[in-house]
Amino acid sequence: MSVRIDRVAMIAEMARQDINGNRLVELSGVSRVTVTAVRNGKSCSKETADKLAAVLGRDIIREEA
């Protein structure tokens, strides 16, 4: 299943926690290419969204794609 991320919420939470893209890659285990794509509005798997959400400590799924 593919989902879309709430980019604004994701980027705001990254800023709030002072987590940059590289750190998000390290903490989540998600590839740099995927993190960049998600930050730019591309959809991702539910599994990927869950990994990113776990690091950020909040739900960031906007909708199923």
Model features per residue range: what roles?
Residues 27, 38, 65:
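Residue-level "edge-of-site" marker
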Residues 47-62:
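DNA major-groove recognition helix of helix-turn-helix/homeodomain DNA-binding modules
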Residues 30-43:
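Recognition helix of helix-turn-helix/homeodomain-like DNA-binding domains
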Residues 6, 44-45:
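Residue-level preference for nonpolar/small residues embedded in alpha-helices
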Residues 1-26, 61:
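A short, Lys/Arg-rich alpha-helix, primarily the initiator
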